[in-house]
Structures are given as structure tokens and as C-alpha cells.
Design a protein with these regions (language model features):
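Short, aromatic- and glycine-rich surface loops/edge beta-strands on solvent-exposed regions
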Residues: 135-138, 283-295
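Beta-strand-rich binding/interaction modules
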Residues: 105, 215-255
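Conserved, mostly hydrophobic/aromatic
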Residues: 107, 189, 287, 327
Length: 347
């Protein structure tokens, strides 16, 4: 069984204008910073987790004043209590931190991460204080890139040396805004507590279509943690048509756990598959893989992942490069479109 505690409310924030927070110990487990002379701002209440420009800027899409959001790092703090319970595993998970992030819990450094749309997590079972207050501190920054290739300042837009994998041009994912460089925590921050047995969020699903693309062999692989060594667990996989809910295949694999973290694999055969296609060539048929981990009659954990069957080929020679989707020619149109330069404004 697992319990998810979403750390959504109660966040506080400050901007570390001199970038001295690590030296002065802003990550320490304490209720308030009472130091004098550091010129560090007071903690302010943060109403929600999203890009900071969307919260604090009067006009978040243009203007020189936006540059101050990236001149110095930001520190986030929240406090939470964890029920006094017996757990086999505890994971702290972030879905989005834009862009560089360092994380501390109860004054202890957990690690760091870079990348704004890649979830990351830490095992914190031995770091939590059960039944008492816990302190989570995160340092976040998305600095400007200053160096330009060959010092060609008149071509800065295309020749700036990129230290971050973000933005089609300099820092923006849409139009070319000189002063927009999104920064902040958004999405979900959650603590996942496991009493016994939990499936990882990430599922590795692959398939092979037969020559007439009417049947498919589906291969599902995932990891489970928090298992009890020597116990027997059932790993069940159902493949459904997403639109109708019809079960197309089902299989259960039984395994005896040798350690707390164990991998599960399952192979299924699906008949009469419906192929995903673009709107102008057919219909985007979707499927769902439902994964369930149980011990005896007790369901411990479940996950669902969406996927589609399709056959993609590429034809390439000296004269042409051509794509085929489900045995039909496909013309690849534009990509990399974002309706907003702040991803947190789209969710």
C-alpha cells in the first residue's frame, strides 16, 4: 500500500540576491532565519507552485524588469509532518523544476538536478522524522547565458552558447523574447510512502507487430520497491482499448521477491489491433496498459500507461527521404510549437 502526500500548500520563498544562501546555511532545519547582517531577504508566502514570473511580474511576457528573476537564485521552503507509521520506502518526487535545483531535507543535502520537464526523485526513508515536523528546502536558478560563439554579438540569438536545454532560441520556447527566461518550481512535489510494495511510476512498454500489422506482441517491464524478501507477489497486466474499455489481453506473472527492489516482466499477445494514425490518414486509436501488484488478496499498487500501436518506416536514398505510417506515405509538417513560453501556464 502507498500513501501520497502532495506538498502543494505552505511554501515560502526568497531571492538570494548575493547568492550566499549556501554559505549562510539557508538549508538548515529551523523555523526562521534570525541572522543579522547577511542581507538575505525574509521568507515570503508563496501562493502556488508555478513559474515565478507568472506570480510576481505585472507583465510576464516582455519588459526589462523581467531580467531580475534570473539575476540571482531563489530558495523555497516548506514544512510538513509525516504520520508515525511503519514504512518500507519513502520517496520525495518533483515533476518540474526550471532549471537547476538543489534539495535539502532536515538540513541534509539530498542531491541536485537540471532540466525543466524531467521528473526526479530521492529516497528519503532514512532522512524523515516521523510524527514530527520536517523541513524541505530547494534552491532554484535559471541563469542567463553570457558567452556567444566567436563573440559574434550581432548574431547572439542563434550563436549564444547554451548551458541549458531549453528554449528554441535563447531561453524561450516560443517567440524570441530577450528578457524572458522562465524560472521556478511547478507541477507536483509529493512524498510517496510505502508500507509494502509499490510499482515505479515509469513503465517500459514495447511491442512488435506481425507482418500484416493485425497482431502484436507486447512487452511490459517495470520495477517494484518496498517488497518483503521471501514473499510471493502477483504482477497483473491488462491491455485495454482506451475508447471502449474492452480488455484485449491479460496476464499474471508470479514472482518471489529476493530483495526489496525487484523487476517484473510480462509478455502479452494482442489480436486485431487498431493502428494509431494522424487525423488526415485515419483515427488516433489509443490503448491502456493497467499494471497491478498484489500479495494474496491485497492490492498493493497499480499504474496505468497510455500507448498506441503504429508501424513507422523510413525510406532514404540519394534522391529522397520519405516517411511511411501504417504503409501510407506521411508528410512531416512543423514541430516544436508551444502555445505559451511558460509551461506552467499551460497546465
Amino acid at each position: 500500500m502507498e500513501t501520497r502526500i502532495e506538498l502543494k500548500q505552505g511554501w515560502k520563498i526568497l531571492q538570494d540576491v548575493h547568492d550566499t544562501g549556501e554559505k549562510t546555511g539557508l538549508y538548515a532545519a529551523r523555523e526562521a532565519d534570525t541572522s543579522v547582517g547577511s542581507q538575505v531577504s525574509e521568507w515570503e508566502e508563496l501562493e502556488e507552485l508555478k513559474h515565478l514570473q507568472l506570480i510576481y511580474a505585472r507583465q510576464p511576457y516582455f519588459g526589462r524588469e523581467l531580467r531580475y528573476f534570473n539575476q540571482a537564485p531563489w530558495w523555497y521552503k516548506t514544512e510538513f509532518e509525516v504520520p508515525d507509521q511503519k514504512v518500507t520506502d519513502a520517496v520525495l518526487k518533483f515533476t518540474n523544476v526550471d532549471y537547476y535545483g538543489k534539495v535539502w531535507i532536515n538540513g541534509e543535502f539530498l542531491g541536485e538536478h537540471e532540466g525543466y520537464s524531467a521528473p526526479f526523485s530521492f529516497n528519503v526513508k532514512d532522512k524523515l522524522v516521523f510524527g514530527e515536523k520536517n523541513y524541505l528546502i530547494v534552491k532554484v536558478s535559471s541563469p542567463w547565458d553570457d558567452e556567444v560563439e566567436l563573440d559574434a554579438q550581432d548574431s547572439r540569438t542563434t550563436l549564444v552558447k547554451r548551458n541549458m536545454v531549453k528554449g528554441t532560441y535563447e531561453h524561450s520556447d516560443t517567440f524570441i523574447q530577450r528578457d524572458v527566461n522562465p524560472v521556478g518550481i511547478y507541477g507536483k512535489v509529493e512524498l510517496i510512502l510505502t508500507e509494502e510494495g509499490v510499482l515505479e511510476d515509469q513503465t517500459d512498454l514495447k511491442y512488435e507487430l506481425d507482418p500484416d500489422v493485425r497482431k502484436a506482441d507486447v512487452y511490459v517491464e517495470t520495477e517494484a520497491r518496498g517488497l518483503k524478501s521471501g514473499e510471493t507477489y502477483d504482477f497483473n497486466v491488462k491491455i485495454r482499448e482506451k475508447e471502449s474499455g474492452l480488455i484485449k489481453a491479460e496476464k499474471t506473472v508470479q514472482i518471489m521477491a529476493e530483495k526489496a527492489e525487484t523487476g517484473f516482466k510480462c509478455e502479452l499477445k494482442v489480436e486485431d489491433v487498431r493502428l494509431w494514425s494522424t487525423w488526415d490518414h485515419g483515427y488516433p486509436w489509443m490503448y491502456q496498459a493497467e499494471l497491478t501488484l498484489s500479495r494474496g488478496k491485497d492490492i498493493l499498487s497499480s499504474r496505468t500507461t497510455n500507448f498506441a500501436f503504429r508501424d513507422i518506416q523510413i525510406e532514404r536514398n540519394e534522391k529522397i527521404t520519405r516517411f511511411w505510417l501504417n504503409n501510407r506515405k506521411l508528410y512531416i509538417r512543423g514541430t516544436s510549437y508551444f502555445p505559451d513560453c511558460y509551461i506552467s501556464a499551460m497546465t
